[in-house]
Amino acid sequence: MLSVRNLVKVYPGPVTALQGVSLDIGTGMFGLLGPNGAGKSTFMRILAGVLEPTSGSVTLDGRDVLADPNALWSVLGYLPQDFGFFPHLSGQAMLEYLLELKGIATGKETRKLAASLLERVNLAYAAKRKVKEYSGGMRQRLGIAQAVAGDPRLIIVDEPTAGLDPEERHRFYRILAELAERRTVLLSTHIVEDVAVLCPRFAVIRNGQVVAETSPGEARRMLAGSIFEGAVATGDLAALQAAKRVTQAVLVEGRNRVRIHEPSREAPPGFEAAIPTLEDAYFVLMHGRPNATNGAGSTVPSDARVPGVTPIVSDGEVVR
């Protein structure tokens, strides 16, 4: 169990990047979903031991990992958003170097383990190819190969599918799903599909604060009967957005197919009831009604006050 309590990070400025984040994460895949600048990478870097928090605690199976970063690295696999590979090395040589650097293997065992890891992420065919010749998806898979070296109990992956084409993304999904079968995998992303496909549970982070923790199914169920869809002329879209909560708008043959969230559960003229999607739920969780408070003056999404959707905190001035 990974337990995070009241994690705060303040950068010089001062800029508060995290404001009291608390989460309990068990075995399997857990998603941290939020927009760019929400604090995801700061959170992940602290958990990975490469950034010190201002305050708060992080324990893994009861062990204080912030107090002993070296112990953390023995059980951690980390794939940051921008992983620094040596472009002139082959994939095989890159993994061999990392395995020896981390003290996982030496000599012939290093070559054998590197080859096994490349096979695991479907890169054996490119073992001798230079990393600079790898596609974005291949580089991500190489990153996962180094992250799982040593069979870590905790794997942290930060924005792993950003920039990948659909084929590479789904190939990466399969690899991550296999990894989560017997260990804790924490995934940060701004892509709703990542969470929908991979994560039994996830948290939504906004402005350095977790606004809700839930599952994809629970998040969709909280909107039952309150999502409606209709066609709107482009010239009328701005007025609709000013009057209603527009969760999605897609231009189709000159008209906008628009989805709205209507808390009254009454369909506006020209709209029909629609099945809620996780994209709808994410929008609602990110834009809570300002008249709902958590008792401390902060607003929370009132729509999240249903069984299975735990409002944590929201609102605050943060940029990371």
Stretches with model-predicted labels:
Residues L2-V4, K9-R206:
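ABC transporter nucleotide-binding domains
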Residues V8, Q92, V192, G217, ...:
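Alpha-helix N-cap/helix-start and coil->helix boundary motif
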Residues T27, Y125, T234, E262-S264, ...:
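Non-catalytic surface loops within mature trypsin-like serine protease
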Residues G77, G103, A224, M286-H287:
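A generic structural signal for secondary-structure junctions
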Residues R111, A233, I275-E279:
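A structural signal for well-ordered alpha-helical scaffolds and beta->alpha junctions
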Residues R171-R259:
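ABC transporter nucleotide-binding domain
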Residues V252-R320:
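C-terminal coupling/interaction segments
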